């Protein structure tokens, strides 16, 4: 239960904070913790998939040392910034050559977004006034962007321009959520450009 889990998670957060030189934000600490989370093998059975989000959330966090040191087959980048209204942060990079075979990009992608949105209690159920989302994918030859990730637990992302009902945007895109996780395992490869973006 939460009375047992909460102190363990708080201890891990405190250990991460202590192990990092200098000061980092609360959002960065939470992002590091959540980014490390994994789903135990017990819960990977097919019968759990439809309820996994409500039963285990983003999963169980690793210990502080594993969170900060990672492993030799992965890299984690942390972007910590204050995003002003109607602005965005964009980062371009080339897909690692060691993960390109026969013109296709391979690898596992995981993105964790943690924000502290403005809250206005005058709006009651709609008190959260900002929605921040992530797009990650290929930069096409015409300079357009092709998104290649979807929110965790979703098989097909819904665009903000699809004119969906508010509840659908909340369910499918995790709209208004201050914590969002996106993930994709590229086992069969993605053809096309090897220049990618994070936005």
Which residues are covered by each model-predicted region?
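Noncatalytic modules at the cell exterior or secretory-pathway interfaces
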Residues: 107-109, 175-199
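Surface-exposed beta-strand/loop patches in noncatalytic accessory domains
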Residues: 122-178
């Amino acid at each position: 239960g939460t009375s047992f889990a909460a102190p363990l998670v708080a201890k891990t957060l405190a250990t991460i904070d202590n192990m990092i030189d200098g000061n980092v934000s609360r959002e960065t600490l939470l992002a590091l913790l959540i980014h490390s989370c994994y789903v135990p093998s017990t819960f990977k059975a097919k019968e759990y998939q439809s309820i996994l989000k409500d039963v285990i959330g983003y999963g169980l966090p690793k210990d502080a040392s594993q969170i900060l040191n990672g492993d030799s087959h992965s890299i984690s980048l942390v972007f910590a910034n204050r995003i002003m209204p109607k602005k965005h942060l964009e980062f371009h990079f080339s897909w690692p050559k060691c993960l390109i075979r026969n013109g296709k990009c391979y690898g596992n992608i995981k993105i964790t977004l943690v924000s502290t949105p403005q809250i206005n209690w005058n709006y009651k159920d709609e008190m959260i006034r900002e929605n921040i989302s992530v797009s990650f994918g290929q930069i096409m030859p015409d300079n357009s962007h092709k998104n290649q990730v979807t929110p965790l637990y979703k098989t097909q992302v819904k665009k903000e321009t699809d004119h969906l009902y508010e509840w659908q945007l909340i369910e499918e895109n995790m709209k208004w959520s201050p914590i969002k996780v996106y993930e994709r395992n590229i086992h069969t490869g993605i053809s096309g450009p090897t220049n990618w973006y994070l936005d």
